[in-house]
Amino acid sequence: MRNLVMICAILWLGGCGVKSSNEIKNYKILQIKDENLTSDTFWYQRFNDPNLDALINLALKNNADLKKAGLNLKKSMINAGLIEADFAPTLSANSSFNASRDISKGDEFAKKYQNGLTLSYELDLFGKIRANNQSASWSVKYSEFDLENVKITLINSLVSAYFNAIYLQNANKFYEQNLAITRDLERIVRTKFAFGKSEYADVLRIEQNVLETQKSLVNLQSQIATNDELLRNLLGVAPDFNLKFGKNLDEISHTHPDLNVPFYALGNRADIKAMIANLNAKFFDYKVAFADFFPSISLGAGLSDIDAKFSQSYGLNLFSQSVSIKLPFLDFARVKMRAQSADIDFLNALNSYQNALNVAKNEVHKSYALYQNSLENEQISKANLAKLSKLFEISVVQYKYGKTELKEYLSAQKDLINAQISALNAKYETLKNEAQIYKAMGARFVK
């Protein structure tokens, strides 16, 4: 017995000497406290479009991914509650029946009824229960931030799809006008060819132009169908749901995001906070695994009774006490490997956090660049549209006084329509990139 105690003591001390080969740290979630910096998570309302606001509210109620994230949060809270219950004693009851006889004597069966209540409590001498509870609490935080991230991503996707729908519908009208003008040009070319004033190659070219315009219109209508499907999936509605788009794209105002927000504002991103929460959960998981290098001590007390009569077995006249000591470190190899596995889980979580932070920085950098480029392109498209509008006005006057042919007039009108489509697309790209900046930063920040 003395030798066994010595062996256990040696293994225990050896377990205490086992440490992670990596420095395990507990990370904290950055709380931004800057009186000169305010965040706005309802940035989409700045577009002043009631239809957009209504669709976002509907999506927040119906979206399947958001519901799933909400259920995951509820589940993690329940799991945390179960683990927190380990701080309290555990009450249990038991009831049993036993019948036996001595077959060598042929006695009758001796019946015994046993009933009892027991109360047990594990002493958290080495912090295993506390660490497990902390891990569960951080898992709840992770689920909260994951829900927030799903919500942010949903809003951004819906805003982008909504503006795309308006752009496509506006562009569809221009494409239809373009097709009508191209067909008018085709009739003019055919008439000229019939009177010998045009070559057959001109007929082939205009026919090819008509086909290309038809193809562009069909492709645009396919984009409308695809985007409508995306919108309905985000909203969680069926095909019979009537999508409403109140404004034309040129009526929607820009929100002018601030491109000089301090770097530390990235700590507001929900996915970054989720990664930190997961990192902390893995840290405490490691502490739980490391606690197995120490003994586990439980105290117990109980009331019980045994009687030959069932009705007399509930007296609970027998009081008992117990002390239970578990030595998980005796299975040293498995305990050590579990600790090493928890160490690797922590390192994976740390790597995921560092990668997420780097991805976030690159996403913001890209979003700023795309926004600035789209803003410049929008200004160029507006200037080009203004010049083509003046040229078309000149063509109208020239055609009115017979200084130009119908073909040149229609060509000028077609160029104007193409410029209007280009300007619409540039406006959509700018609006989309504005929303992407707010998604990349986790909110709209204003100094």
Predicted regions and their residues:
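Sec-dependent signal peptide recognition
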Residues: 1-7
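Bacterial Sec-pathway N-terminal export signals of envelope proteins
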Residues: 17-79, 246, 250-280, 329
